[in-house]
């Protein structure tokens, strides 16, 4: 029965992908210019953050790059400068509230108002729940969601005054579905998706329609935090593909950026009738979506 349901899901995904491609071909979304705008990217020392910085550098944005890894973020900055961008580098621990507030104040003094912020810094410690260390659970939430609160609280006032800006939350498909051995990570990403949605609603209520929000939700990204990743329907992505999708989503003011895009319909179909997940010991787990495939977590610590 599971194979039949997966086949139907695959058919739905294929149909959706073709229809989406046709719509994009005949009705392309208008792209905005970010040339000269100040863009703050956290977790810019490698991975998605680094490659997103490259994409903004190609757009001739002015970059403010944060990372806890000085060497990594300096390497990112060097490449961005070669691409023609003006770059400012800050070594920041995004799990430290005081450090975040102090760094934002420094950015305001030395660079000016931030017009686009990409909250990308992330932490993950794969383990079953009982093996997860308390300090690792705490660190996961400090970086993956609490850091978002402190950064936006510090940057939002100037955006509200101007009624202009763009707030980007880097979450994950794990903010919509679940996977074993990543309970703290999945929980923090559910919180990140909720943060994006609640902030979007609040800005709309305030009438601040000039402030855009986007949330990036990729599936598994090849950043080395899992061993032998394999999925039946969802691919393992390269960071370059995710960064390109993110910049395209930002330039078109897309609210929810799924990578690949058919993940959206996949999640909807899996939550529909007949697609409820079964607990290994029996029973149903609706409406939470299990992520298909088999991922064996490594012991590596990941920062985006």
From Swiss-Prot:
Pfam families on file: adh_short
InterPro entries: NAD(P)-bd_dom_sf, SDR_fam
UniProt keyword Transferase present: no
UniProt gene name: Hsd17b13
Example of a GO MF term: all-trans-retinol dehydrogenase (NAD+) activity
Active site: 185
Protein name: 17-beta-hydroxysteroid dehydrogenase 13
UniProt keyword terms in alphabetical order: Acetylation, Endoplasmic reticulum, Lipid droplet, Lipid metabolism, NAD, Oxidoreductase, Phosphoprotein, Signal
Amino-acid positions noted as binding substrate in the UniProt annotation, renumbered to this chain: 172
Chief localisation class: other
GO biological process, one term: positive regulation of lipid biosynthetic process
């Amino acid at each position: 029965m599971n194979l039949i349901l997966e086949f139907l899901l695959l058919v739905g995904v294929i149909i959706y992908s073709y229809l989406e491609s046709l719509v994009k071909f005949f009705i392309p979304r208008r792209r905005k210019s970010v040339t000269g705008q100040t863009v703050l990217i956290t977790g810019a020392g490698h991975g998605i953050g680094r490659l997103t910085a490259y994409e903004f550098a190609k757009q001739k944005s002015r970059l403010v790059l944060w990372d806890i890894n000085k060497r990594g973020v300096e390497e990112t900055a060097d490449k961005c400068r070669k691409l023609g961008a003006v770059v400012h580098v800050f070594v920041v621990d995004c799990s430290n509230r005081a450090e975040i507030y102090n760094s934002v104040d420094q950015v305001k003094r030395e660079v000016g108002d931030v017009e686009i912020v990409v909250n990308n810094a992330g932490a993950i410690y794969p383990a079953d729940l009982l093996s997860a260390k308390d300090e690792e659970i705490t660190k996961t939430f400090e970086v993956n969601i609490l850091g978002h609160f402190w950064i936006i609280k510090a940057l939002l006032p100037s955006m509200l005054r101007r009624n202009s800006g763009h707030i980007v939350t880097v979450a994950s498909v794990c903010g919509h579905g679940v996977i074993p051995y990543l309970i703290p990570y999945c929980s923090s990403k559910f919180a990140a998706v909720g943060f994006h949605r609640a902030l979007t609603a609040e800005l709309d209520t305030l009438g601040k329609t000039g402030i855009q929000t986007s949330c990036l939700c990729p599936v598994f990204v090849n950043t080395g935090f899992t061993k032998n990743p394999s999925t039946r329907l969802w691919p393992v992505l390269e960071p370059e593909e995710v960064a390109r999708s993110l910049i395209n989503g930002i330039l078109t003011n897309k609210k929810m950026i799924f990578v690949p895009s058919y993940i959206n319909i996949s999640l909807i179909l899996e939550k529909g009738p007949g697609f409820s997940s079964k607990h290994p010991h029996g029973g149903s787990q609706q409406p939470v979506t299990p992520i298909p495939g088999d991922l064996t977590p490594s012991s590596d610590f990941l920062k985006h």
